[in-house]
């Protein structure tokens, strides 16, 4: 039986629960080519300065929107061209989420990490298709799922022959329009063998909380991120934007990009202490 690797390499970035903190970051959705390059360039500069391994993320299609009229992204074909050019320009690996089995084969030649959205984390055919590409697979734990139930989710990937899987905690449903973060989930998921990522921005979402769109409490991103890093994780997932209040999706929980350097500097200090103990 194939088991999950405790250390997963994505290009030049290492994810391990005992290694220095790595970062998955970028805007929620890919808006335009120019915007992607602006965000990527700023993230590359700050992470190089701080010595943090960066995987750049963005979504080509936000398939799970609150409203039918909500913006969804620039689409698969255009996004793959941009991802390819970003990799050539900046040399970092990239991540995007996929929603159907057919998308796996199209995305895998360009994208380094295929991400399974939380609401799709139990979709067996999707997990198998992602695993069979040979790419690293990052699975978001469903808001409805206990952390120990991720054992079966990860097994669908590893038993399809792919040990390179990441497990991401992004909060659990707590009544209506609210998520909470149970920090016990982090060591429980780490005990399953895979590197654990904490999604600090989706964890402060208020799903559907604005009626026609999702709300959020970005003022608590740092609080939860500090707690997760103090517990000990392989990496953080943080969505960021230069103007979150006018972003096409997930603005209320994204971190303004000009706040990112100071935030990352604090979190790296917590990480060094946590992993030295």
UniProtKB/Swiss-Prot annotation:
Domain of life (superkingdom): Bacteria
UniProt record, GO biological process: keto-3-deoxy-D-manno-octulosonic acid biosynthetic process
EC code(s) of this entry: 2.5.1.55
GO MF term list: 3-deoxy-8-phosphooctulonate synthase activity
UniProt xrefs under InterPro entries: Aldolase_TIM, DAHP1/KDSA, KDO8P_synthase
Catalytic activity line of the entry: D-arabinose 5-phosphate + phosphoenolpyruvate + H2O = 3-deoxy-alpha-D-manno-2-octulosonate-8-phosphate + phosphate
Name the UniProt record assigns to this protein: 2-dehydro-3-deoxyphosphooctonate aldolase
Organism the protein comes from: Brucella melitensis biotype 1 (strain ATCC 23456 / CCUG 17765 / NCTC 10094 / 16M)
Lineage of the organism: Bacteria, Pseudomonadati, Pseudomonadota, Alphaproteobacteria, Hyphomicrobiales
